[in-house]
């Protein structure tokens, strides 16, 4: 095996997806703790003290207890190198989550046992399904009274349309929660909330008399449950899992550390190493000798002391070496990357090398955009980083007119990293913001104040939807001349039609048949 093949086989790059409050941030912390990456699992409930969850580092996230940016964390576990991408937990940030899901090879879906499948989970799973992403399921909060496990599996199968293959099975729930049975190891792990790793004892075999000693009549209930589960549920099928058709299911309680290590072991044992990536011209294999990668996220001011911008790049093929010359395909320029970094949320360190599956950060001053491809020279363009038409719009006004330049710079940077979309109508000097959800405006206002020293006022803007305009240049000029207040340039200087309502949108579509009005576009 070549060094490249060896490093590829060791990589596991995955994201955690869930509905808000299903316990995703807690699970992230506990995975890091079991992986030895952090010393204290900084309980989310302790946020009101000074200790905040490792992956929630932005000021607004600390105040509200939600993740609004995607964090990247790398740590070794067993013989593997784990790249864990935490995703925004609030429904307003589905676009950032979508972009993050383009950079992973698998995902862990967290389901709250009390609430079952929720709206955001459905949306995110649909995104995973578009790419056939393999999904492990962690059913969380078994220490609370929730839905029956068999009902939860039925719900996942019927609502999400994915087969479930239980790998562990819970013994009771809430106050009667005693642990889980491992269906493929024939072992029982007993739950103890006081034990450091959540597990009091592990025994082998359903017929072990120690089982009856420890849980009494629940032992016979468990034996009956397992007989039923083995007969009624799907057996684990590696091929079905890797093609996104089946999800292995684990039960646990992340807040009590229980079931987390089994999940982390499954990431190592079941999840795929880096996979081939589609580009416009061809499929790129991870073990190709030449380096390639794409930018799936840009984050400004990760450390306000440094006033920096970091482009998060997923390595797709070959090996990255510090100081190597790479081609920024969009501009055709060759760059030397001497200061690439790896992450543990806000903590960062300079890296000398990176392999397929790894995420590296490239510091820059606004010269790198979302979706850009980097290679050793080939004119590749990786596909699939989307930008969606916003559903909410605001007009940005500034309290202090002397700070208009800071406002323009701040909005341009925040738009380039994907925190919001910025539109400048062809007539006038208005700055219009578009967002998938209204919380994004709060985030933008907070960041403008904290990072750029600008107080902004957002006013309602009369716009129902936006559409990117492609097609005949002459018709585009006619449209722009006639409706200059409604045609705007976005952050990448692409033309956009800002429709006051659907009647106007349908009217211009009829009037300009050689133009296409697109709801989404690829960023690059």
UniProtKB/Swiss-Prot annotation:
Keywords: Cytoplasm, GTP-binding, Nucleotide-binding, Protein biosynthesis. GO terms for cellular component: cytosol. Gene3D superfamilies: P-loop containing nucleotide triphosphate hydrolases (3.40.50.300), Peptide chain release factor 3, domain III (3.30.70.3280). GTP binds at residues 18-25, 86-90, 140-143. GO terms for molecular function: GTP binding; GTPase activity; translation release factor activity, codon nonspecific; translation release factor activity, codon specific. CDD domains: RF3 (cd04169), RF3_II (cd03689), RF3_III (cd16259). Residues 9-275 form the tr-type G domain. Pfam families: EF-G_D2, GTP_EFTU, RF3_C. GO terms for biological process: regulation of translational termination. Increases the formation of ribosomal termination complexes and stimulates activities of RF-1 and RF-2. It binds guanine nucleotides and has strong preference for UGA stop codons. It may interact directly with the ribosome. The stimulation of RF-1 and RF-2 is significantly reduced by GTP and GDP, but not by GMP. This is Peptide chain release factor 3. It comes from Dechloromonas aromatica (strain RCB). The gene is prfC.
